[in-house]
Each structure stands twice: as structure tokens, then as C-alpha cells.
């Protein structure tokens, strides 16, 4: 009588290594879909502001959700502004106006100045 086929040994319980590829029945390997997030950028900004402070994965999830929400609001408002002015392109001017409309007082001023600085840096590096 033939011996039953042995399956691969189960990983140790304390193993921390993440499995990057899922095993299919026919032996082919399938890559997992990549989940895009702003976590790398949130972490970089955190280290600029508070070098000795860390962030939990739950807090990072909240920050990621926050950035996505603000992005959608600004993009939506900029789209509306372009539509009102019969334009088919969203420019930095629409983004700037959208930020002024969405963010309150001093926060809008700081956001506009940082945005202008970023656009200037980008255009000068081209």
C-alpha cells in the first residue's frame, strides 16, 4: 500500500516571518495584492516633528483614513471649482482655492504656504 503524501511542515508558532506568496492547489504561486497607504509618509513626517516618538498600527490606520478623507474632499472641491469655471483641468489654483474653502483660518494659511513651497521646489528641480 502506498504511503500518504506528506504535507509541508507547519511553521513554528512563534515564527514572525510573513508569507509573501499564497500557495495554490496546482503548485503555482500567486502574489498577494498590494495595499496602498500613506503610512511611509506619515512616519517620515512624524520623525521630522518628533524623532523619539513612535506610532501604533491602529493610530497609523486612523492617520491613513484621515489623509484619504482630506484628499477626497480637496479633490472633490477642486473638481467642482473647475466645473463651475468651465475648465477641464484641475490646476494648483483650484487646489489652493479648495484648501482655502475647506480648512479653517490659520490652518488654511499654513497649508497654502506649504503647498506653494512644495510646488516651487518641484518646478525648480525639473
Swiss-Prot record:
The modification N6-methyllysine is found at residues 47, 109. Glycans are attached at residue 113. Residues 1-12 have a biased composition (Low complexity). The modification Phosphothreonine is found at residue 116. The modification N6-(2-hydroxyisobutyryl)lysine is found at residues 6, 13, 21, 24-25, 35, 44, 47, 58, 86, 109, 117, 121. The modification N6-methylated lysine is found at residue 117. The modification N6,N6-dimethyllysine is found at residue 58. There is a cross-link at residues 6, 21 (Glycyl lysine isopeptide (Lys-Gly) (interchain with G-Cter in SUMO2)). Its main location: nucleus. The modification PolyADP-ribosyl glutamic acid is found at residue 36. The modification N6-malonyllysine is found at residue 117. GO terms for molecular function: DNA binding; identical protein binding; protein heterodimerization activity; structural constituent of chromatin. The modification N6-acetyllysine is found at residues 6, 12-13, 16-17, 21, 24, 86. The modification Omega-N-methylarginine is found at residues 87, 93. Residues 1-36 are annotated as: Disordered. The keyword Acetylation applies. Monoubiquitination at Lys-35 (H2BK34Ub) by the MSL1/MSL2 dimer is required for histone H3 'Lys-4' (H3K4me) and 'Lys-79' (H3K79me) methylation and transcription activation at specific gene loci, such as HOXA9 and MEIS1 loci. Similarly, monoubiquitination at Lys-121 (H2BK120Ub) by the RNF20/40 complex gives a specific tag for epigenetic transcriptional activation and is also prerequisite for histone H3 'Lys-4' and 'Lys-79' methylation. It also functions cooperatively with the FACT dimer to stimulate elongation by RNA polymerase II. Phosphorylation at Ser-37 (H2BS36ph) by AMPK in response to stress promotes transcription. Phosphorylated on Ser-15 (H2BS14ph) by STK4/MST1 during apoptosis; which facilitates apoptotic chromatin condensation. Also phosphorylated on Ser-15 in response to DNA double strand breaks (DSBs), and in correlation with somatic hypermutation and immunoglobulin class-switch recombination. GO terms for biological process: antibacterial humoral response; antimicrobial humoral immune response mediated by antimicrobial peptide; defense response to Gram-positive bacterium; innate immune response in mucosa; nucleosome assembly. The modification N6-(beta-hydroxybutyryl)lysine is found at residues 6, 12, 17, 21, 35, 86, 117, 121. Belongs to the histone H2B family. This is Histone H2B type 1-C/E/F/G/I. It comes from Homo sapiens (Human). The gene is H2BC4.
Amino acid at each position: 500500500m502506498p504511503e500518504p503524501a506528506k504535507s509541508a511542515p507547519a511553521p513554528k508558532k512563534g515564527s514572525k516571518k510573513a508569507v509573501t506568496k499564497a500557495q495554490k492547489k496546482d503548485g503555482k504561486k500567486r502574489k498577494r495584492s498590494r495595499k496602498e497607504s500613506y503610512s511611509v509618509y506619515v512616519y517620515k513626517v512624524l520623525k521630522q516633528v518628533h524623532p523619539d516618538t513612535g506610532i501604533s498600527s491602529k493610530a497609523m490606520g486612523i492617520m491613513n483614513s484621515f489623509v484619504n478623507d482630506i484628499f477626497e474632499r480637496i479633490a472633490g472641491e477642486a473638481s467642482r471649482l473647475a466645473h463651475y469655471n468651465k475648465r477641464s483641468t484641475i490646476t494648483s489654483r483650484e487646489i489652493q482655492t479648495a484648501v482655502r474653502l475647506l480648512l479653517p483660518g490659520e490652518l488654511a494659511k499654513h497649508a497654502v504656504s506649504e503647498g506653494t513651497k512644495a510646488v516651487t521646489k518641484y518646478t525648480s528641480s525639473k
